[in-house]
Amino acid sequence: MAKRTVITGGPGTGKTALVTELEKQGHYCYHEIIRQMTLQAKKEGNQAMVNPLAFVKDPLAFNRMLLQARIAQFEDASQLQVSSVFYDRGIPDVLAYMDYFEQGYDSEFTQPSQNLRYDAVLLLPPWEAIYQQDNERLESFDQACEIHDILESCYRQYGYEVVAIKPGTLKQRVNEVLDILAQAE
């Protein structure tokens, strides 16, 4: 079975660039669900979904959809014949964001975080030098820092050792990720 590694962190920390570079180097990667949802909606001409977070009428249903999509990624990886898999965000990210937005949830949301386990959780810290707001990233840098703290707390709450990836060039970060995983084997 593939070793499952989550790359997480607040908005604008370089997760997508890191996952994309790992993929270019031949590693199997699952990309951020919200980005996929946004791209699909744009393809279908659904302007209300260009920024899904801004148009959510039922936050619980939206988060349920995100959770199910992340569970599907997790389950899909079980079928792969590869040694490792990287995820741009994991199942507990859904809970962390619900905590950030002060949304309640029940065991429907907590059970997957307890039962579907990743082998490693790598956290990219806030990095003001690369942080930019855009059409998909609406949070301020201070909000990104708060989300980072909630993400770290949430993963630790579910028993994960969270390993921070230092700021650096994309090449340095890729090498650090691969070194950490090689040491864990």
Which residues make up each language-model segment?
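Conserved substrate/cofactor phosphate-moiety recognition/catalytic segment
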Residues: 23-69
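A glycine- and Lys/Arg-enriched "phosphate-lid" helix/loop adjacent to the NTP-binding pocket
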Residues: 102-168
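Glycine-rich phosphate-binding loop used to anchor ATP phosphates in small-molecule kinases
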Residues: 63-116
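C-terminal alpha-helix
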Residues: 176-184
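Conserved glycine(s) of the Walker
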Residues: 14
